Each structure stands twice: as C-alpha cells, then as structure tokens.
Amino acid sequence: MVSTQQRTDDDSSQPVKASLKSYGITEPLSIAGPSAADVKRNLELEKFLVDEGLYESKEETMRREEVVVRIDQIVKHWVKQLTRQRGYTDQMVEDANAVIFTFGSYRLGVHGPMADIDTLCVGPSYVNREEDFFIFFRDILAEMEEVTELQPVTDAHVPVMKFKFQGISIDLLYASISLLVIPQDLDISNSSVLCDVDEQTVRSLNGCRVADQILKLVPNSEHFRTTLRCLKYWAKKRGVYSNVTGFLGGVNWALLVARLCQFYPNAIPSMLVSRFFRVYTQWRWPNPVMLCAIEEDDLSFPVWDPRKNHRDRYHLMPIITPAYPCMNSSYNVSQSTLRVMTEQFQFGNTICQEIELNKQHWSSLFQQYMFFEAYKNYLQVDVLAADAEDLLAWKGWVESRFRQLTLKIERDTNGMLMCHPQPNEYVDTSKQFRHCAFFMGLQRADGFGGQECQQFDIRGTVDEFRQEVNMYMFWRPGMDVHVSHVRRRQLPSFVFPNGYKRSRQSRHQSQQCREPGDEGVGSLSDSVERYAKRKNDDEIMNSRPEKREKRASCSLHTLDAASPDSSGITTSGTPQIGIVPGPRAECLVTGDLVCNVTSLPNVEVEAEKFISKITELRKFSQYEHTSGSEQILEVDSRALVQSYHDLAEPVAKHVRPDLSALLACEGGQNKEIGHDMGSESINDTDTQHLPRRLNVNEDVDEVEREAKLGEIAGGVLWNGHCGRNLDHEGFVTPANLDSAVENRNLHSDGLFKSGLPEELQSNSLLSGTGKLDDGARSESLQNEMMRHVFLQPIIGLCKS
C-alpha cells in the first residue's frame, strides 16, 4: 500500500474567505475577495487551461496511481530480498519494508498529461544507495518488461534513477534513514528522519518535505494549484522553465506562487495570475522569497544564511525552501537568466493590465516566445553520439554544463555580454547520425558605455567549456560536442516549426539579397557561392557605404569537412568554434564577419577548392567589404567576436508601473499592515503605459500596499544580533554590496533598512554596473587559475 502521504483533496473544500490563521512571515497585502469582473475572468482562464489540454483524463489519472502502487510493491519485495540475503532473522525479513512517497508536480496536484512522476523510496539503514539501489535494484528493473529507457544518474546533485514504467516517466530517488524497520505510516515531515544521514539523503528527503510544507502554508490549495498550473504553462511558453539551464524549475515556481497566495489569501486564480506579475516585477532581487521563518536545528545541517555562508551572498534570486534545512532552490540563476526572467515578468505584467481593461484575452499572455527572432547572434552547441542510449546520457551531461558556459561568458566579458540560453533541444531529422542541438542568444548588456567598438575574447571561454564537458566520467567513443557561432539569418531550418522560417523585414538592403538555402545546411562550396553573390550584390547596392572596410590580410587555413565520424554538423555560415582536434578553440565574429582559426593536418580536396576560390576573390584588393559571409582567417593567434550595439531586439519593453494608477479589482476592505513601509516615486513619463484608476475608494489601500512592497521584499530591520530563527524576508544578499551602500539602504550590520529605493530602477546586477564578485562560481567553485581575458578584450560590440 502506498503511503498515506499521497496527494489528497481534503483541503480543497476550504472557504473562499481565509480563516483567522496567519500565513507567511508578513501581513497580507490585501484580504479582499473577487469582484464580479474577476469571477468572469477566472471562468475564462479556467476554460482556456482546459482547452489547452493542461489536465489529464480520469483514465490517465487512474493509470498513474496504479503505476505508483506497482512501484511500491517492487521496492518492498526488493528490500525483503536483500534482508534475507544478508542473514537477518525470519522476523526481520517479514518486517522489512520500504515506502514510496511522491513529490514535485504530482504531489502538488499540478501535473499534466504525459508528465513524469517524481517518487522517493525510503528504505532501512542497512540498504544503501551506491550498491543496493543503483546496482542491485537497477538489475531488477532491467529484467522487467514494463521498464524501458532505464538510466541511473549517480553523479547528479540529487542521485536519481530515471526510467519509464508502462510508458510513464518515473524519477525515483532513494533515501536510507537510520531505522532498521520502516513503518508504513512514516511521517516524513518530522525532522527526526534526518538524523545520521548524509547531505544527498537530506536533499532526497527534502523534495517530499518541501511539497508537504507548501500545501500547508497556502490559504487555499485549489486556488494555488490552478494558479501554479497556469504560470508553469506560461513559463514554458516564454522559455523560462528550466532549472538546469539557469531559469526556474517546478519547485521554484511553486514557491513563488505560494508566497503570492499568502499576500492575497482570498484572491482567486485570475487575480493571482495578474498580481503575480505585478509583485515580482517590483521585487528587489536578491532579497529572498520565503514562506516561513528560517529555522535552525540541533542537527547542524547548513541552512541558507548569507551572514554566515560566503557562497550564499552570490545568489541572485534566492527562493528559500520552507522545510529544514532551508536552502536556496534557485542557486542556478545567473545574471543573464535573471535579466531574461525580469523582462518576461514585465511582459506578463503589461498583458495582464490590458486583460483587466478587456483589451486583451488570456491567449495573449501565453504567446510563444520567438527566441530565434529576438537576437542577431547565437551560439549553437551540437551534441553527437554513436547511438540513442549514448546520446541520452551524453546530452544530459552537456545540458547540465550548458549553464556553466553562460557563467563563463559573463565572467570573461566582465558581465558586458549577456547570454540567453534556450532550454529546448532541437534535432535535424534529415541527419542519419544521433545528435541534438542547443542554442544561446547573445546580447550586449544594458548600462555599459565606453568605446563605440569594444571587443571581447570568448575563444578561451569556449575552449574551457569544451574541456569541462570532456571530463565526463562515462565518456564513450562517438560522444562529441561542437560549438558554432551563427547569425540569425544563418540559423538552420530545423529550429523552426515545420522547417519554415517566418518572413522578416531585413534591417539592411544587403540582407535582402540572400539565397533561399542561406538558413539551411550546406557545403563549403555553397558557402563560397553565396559569399560571392553577397559581395557582388553589396557592391551594386552600396548598402553600407558609411561603414569602414575591414582588413583581411591574414593567411588562410582549412576547415575540415564535417561528417558524423569526424567533426560533426557544419551549418551554412556556421564556423566551428574550437571543437576540433589540435590547438586552442577559436571563435571569431566581427560584425557580419564570421571567422574561425583551425590547424588540421589532413586537408580535404573540397576545402582546398574553397581556399582557392576565396583567394581569387581577394586578389583585386587587400581590403574588402563583408556582409554576413564566412572567412577562414588566422588573426595573430587570437579570435574575435564582434557584433553591433543592437545585437538583439528587446524582449519586452521596460515599464516601471505607476502604482498609483494600477487597476485592482478588489471588492472588500483591506487590513492595514502593521509596520511602516517606505513609499516609491514613479516617473510620470511611464504612466502612459498603464490603465487609469477605476475605483479609487476601493482600490487605494491595496495600491498603497503594493507601492510599499519593498518593505516586504527588502526592508525588515534586523537588530544586529542573530537569534535561533531567521524570520525576516529582507536580509542583504547582493553579489555587490557596494551598490546597496550607495543607495543608503544598509545599516552597519549589513541589512536593509528602508526597502526599495526612491525610484524603481534596474538592479545593479541586471544593468551590469555592479561587480560580478565571482559570479561564475559553480557548485564545484572554480579556483584562482581561471583566466580573465577582459584585460585584452577582443569581442567588438559596436554601435550601429
């Protein structure tokens, strides 16, 4: 029998009006209930979610429950078998037990069709993880016909066994606790289960413990579930749902929504969705989001505390788990991904304001983010393997290191080159070999002045990323990775729906003279033909006469022809970046000029023809005008990446909301917050983007509270001494404490006093004006041997 901890709906009958119980560490922002307009919008939202297929059928729900029961039976039999083999008494064999718990979206009740089930097996102390679970139990699963795609991940932050059982994806963790016999009614929320266990076991147990605490700390679980289901779908549509890539995962979104439910205990989902974007657009990161006080315990496990733990000070978007030991669930967030999420929150806030004015429908909020139209420059990471099984393991490893590439680029460019990793993978079905591709958008960070043409070097950055990836413990022949720079017009066709790229108005006339196959996969000779055509067209059209010609007085080298057996995928206009045998990896992009330096011993005939054609094109001039063409150059053994100031088009317009004009459809009275909060001033020029106030008498209280949200986000005064409970949501954890001092928001003990600054402004970490303070640190903490190449920058970012 599966543990009684499984998801129940006993709390779904909670009344709309919140009880007298207090939720969260602060008073709510508003206790008002929904208006008639809110109820109407809520019905429309729920209908939209059903029409989008976010709910599974009753048959599939029953099938999932049967699978969980079956897995519970399997682990019980496994533990009894181990107990007998180790010579325990018959009574011990009879009492031997293991219990299956669920967590994640399934436990919270927000899973959709085809979603996986996160499960935890809790076993006795004599059954270990390393041998008994990942070897003996794995062999049992491998012999079962119902089990497919079995993949143990032993080196993960939380070790997991991944497989499909009767077609349903299962993520199974294991935790061995200090009990000889596991009771069937084990209370996993009791801290005693954490006695005498290692940190990996604590992390495994905390998935279930956190899920239980979340459901206990929200005023209305059904409203929480609907809102969370909605916002998870929104995050996937907007490309910001992925913990491994540096965005937010399921537990992160659940904690953000739960905190919002505490702010508005009587709000219904349509209100909560709108207020989600309103609140988190104004939130002053890195002030933490917490559902309850951070408690310490005699077990002495480390808890999130930036005063004591040096590494906690570098967390950019702390979202703290409510179960002991409290941790930051969003430590993967980087400066670049925080910028992307902030822009998407602003997009959602703008759309929700228009929905409240009946100018937009809910479908507008869930528009697919057009990632491949947002930037001019991308990095393409191609992952190859010999067979499907190898690709599954290799792809997971490369994806887990993809976040490190973002951090390294931020580090080596001093935060001036921002990255936007795309969580999804793409496959070219026309290829015979096993592969997939990941992409990353590149954009110059806002707020950096200086030279009109500033250069950075990411050649060594890519090389360092390659070296780390190749340290994979389970590497096998055929596993390879290639990194390429591609411009928007050179993107391969397989990244677009049905292989079709939407038509787009070109910025320059020279871009209008393209061959139809410019975005697809082509040979080196095709690149030469397109190069010659673009060059001739540019000379005729004279599209950019004001631009200074670029010198190309460098010796030529060859680029090895791509094949599944050697170097991998070569896309038209896509030079290889350092993922080739030989010396250091090279990556060069100079405006429209894409260059790559390689030195290969075996020169293909086709490559020789390519060189000769390029040489002929250069004979008439030592200077030449380039437009999106590729050249193979050697530039003083250094490589360049240069692009223009308008590298990317804005994802969403930065709008600072006029809080005095925000629409709040509340029908009741608001309770006053019992402590003083500093107000904010908003630029009048920004008010044109927001709706006008409709009902001043009913809405003014909530508007004032939201205007003072900074007190909750960052303004609770700490008296300078440490108690047993860290019960404030406002301690200082910025990666750059200097910026906080300049804003005069710090006491001598390093804590925020007055919350938000006088004006809503970009976080210094987003604008890039703050120090990085070792922002590229990973869990393994890179040492001082890391290279900093920004002293001799080679990436040019020029104003157009």
Swiss-Prot record:
GO molecular function: ATP binding; metal ion binding; poly(A) RNA polymerase activity; RNA binding
Compositionally biased intervals (Basic and acidic residues): 527-538
Region (Disordered), start-end ranges: 497-576
Positions that bind Mg(2+) 2: 116, 118, 171
Nuclear localization signal 2, short sequence motif: residues: 533-540
Keywords, sorted A to Z: ATP-binding, Cytoplasm, Magnesium, Metal-binding, mRNA processing, Nucleotide-binding, Nucleotidyltransferase, Nucleus, Repeat, Transferase
Effect of inactivating the gene: Lethal.
Broad class of the protein's primary localization: nucleus
Coiled-coil region(s): none
Cofactor(s) recorded in Swiss-Prot or TrEMBL: Mg(2+); Mn(2+)
Catalysis performed (reactions): RNA(n) + ATP = RNA(n)-3'-adenine ribonucleotide + diphosphate
InterPro entries listed in its UniProt record: NT_sf, NuclTrfase_I-like_C, PolA_pol_cen_dom, PolA_pol_NTPase, PolA_pol_RNA-bd_dom
CDD domains in alphabetical order: NT_PAP_TUTase (cd05402)
Pfam families in the cross-refs: PAP_central, PAP_NTPase, PAP_RNA-bind
Tissues and organs where the protein is expressed, per its UniProt entry: Mostly expressed in flowers (highly in the style, receptacle and pedicel, but weakly in the vasculature of sepals) and hypocotyls, and, to a lower extent, in roots and stems. Barely detected in leaves (petioles and vascular system).
Polar residues: bias regions: 564-575
Binding site for ATP: 103-105, 115-118, 171, 232, 241, 250-251
EC number: 2.7.7.19
Cofactor info, note text: Binds 2 magnesium ions. Also active with manganese.
GO terms under cellular component: cytoplasm; nucleus
SUBUNIT field: Monomer. Forms a complex with cleavage and polyadenylation specificity factor (CPSF) subunits CPSF100, CPSF30, FIPS5 and PABN2.
Described purpose of this protein according to its UniProt entry: Essential protein. Polymerase that creates the 3'-poly(A) tail of mRNA's. Also required for the endoribonucleolytic cleavage reaction at some polyadenylation sites. May acquire specificity through interaction with a cleavage and polyadenylation specificity factor (CPSF) at its C-terminus. Mediates the polyadenylation of RNAs that are associated with polynucleotide phosphorylase (e.g. PNP1).
Protein's UniProt name: Nuclear poly(A) polymerase 2
Lineage summary: Eukaryota, Viridiplantae, Streptophyta, Embryophyta, Tracheophyta
